[in-house]
């Protein structure tokens, strides 16, 4: 059982704040007993403090009462108030502390635990999750995971089983996959208006090298920035040789002045977007590290 952590002044926190602007006001509730009535669930779950309280309650109560069947192990991570606290039902494990992590997202923590499964000799790992970001993370890091990686998505009525290990992906594309996903839109970054993943993937297939080195360093170099800008130019005009987004924007505006939202972004706006995507890619690249060294978002 893996939970998100709720860190203030983070990229994830900023994303949650934007989502809250479109919703009703939350109601603060501290969850401290199993008979407690939550009331309006939507107004409860909108507040980070409520979600953190619920995660801590579940983590504490389950760890106190759970009795694992023979041959099974339950690990709980991310839900306790203490950042590095985690719990395993297998009291004989000597290496369990290696899973103590300070990841903000459960997405990356899933990959960390999946790698632990492979390190312990298991050949197959099953992951219950409906998040596209997790699927992309598993693909990007699958060389460090089990031989078989199954992701259980869908709903209880319509289940979907994704064999991650069978998805064809060249090594060049695998190395740039996280950067591609961050640039074209994920939970943390916005999507370019009118540019879906299918179109973006077609452009990516022809030029995966344009994301080389994105997410490797917190301070993005001029060369990496220029390659990412050239990729975005191709998103709006796949056949273009233009590498400057302002020129591509001007050309698109001359062709059609009706839908301004569908025009390419300005270079200033795009640079901020690329820097944001670079930081998120760096976080994902470090998913296998329990306590990765990351700069503050405002310093990147």
Range-by-range predicted roles:
Residues 1-300:
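Noncatalytic, typically N-terminal accessory segments of nucleic acid-processing enzymes
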């Amino acid at each position: 059982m893996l939970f998100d952590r709720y860190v203030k002044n983070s990229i994830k926190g900023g994303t949650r704040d934007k989502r809250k602007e479109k919703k009703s006001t939350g109601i603060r509730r501290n969850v401290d007993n199993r008979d407690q009535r939550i009331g309006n669930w939507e107004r409860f779950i909108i507040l980070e403090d409520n979600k953190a309280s619920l995660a801590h309650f579940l983590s504490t109560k389950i760890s106190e009462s759970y009795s694992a069947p023979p041959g099974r192990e339950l690990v709980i991570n991310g839900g306790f108030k203490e950042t590095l606290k985690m719990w395993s039902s297998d009291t004989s494990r000597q290496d369990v502390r290696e899973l103590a992590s300070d990841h903000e997202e459960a997405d990356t923590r899933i990959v960390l635990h999946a790698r632990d499964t492979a390190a312990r000799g298991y050949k197959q790992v099953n992951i219950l999750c409906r998040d596209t970001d997790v699927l992309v993370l598993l693909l990007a890091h699958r060389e460090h995971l089990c031989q078989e990686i199954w992701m259980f998505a869908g709903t209880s009525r319509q289940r979907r089983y994704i064999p991650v290990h069978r998805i064809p992906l060249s090594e060049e594309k695998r190395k740039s996959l996280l950067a591609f996903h961050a640039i074209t839109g994920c939970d943390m970054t916005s999507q370019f208006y009118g540019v879906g993943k299918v179109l973006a993937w077609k452009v990516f297939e022809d030029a995966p090298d344009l994301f080389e080195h994105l997410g490797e360093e917190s301070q993005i170099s001029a060369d990496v920035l220029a390659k990412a800008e050239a990729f975005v130019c191709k998103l709006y005009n796949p056949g273009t040789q233009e590498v400057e987004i302002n020129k591509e924007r001007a050309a698109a505006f001359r062709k059609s002045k009706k839908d301004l939202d569908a025009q390419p972004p300005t270079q200033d706006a795009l640079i901020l977007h690329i820097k944001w995507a670079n930081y998120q890619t760096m976080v994902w690249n470090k998913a296998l590290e329990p306590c990765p060294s990351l700069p503050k978002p405002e310093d990147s």
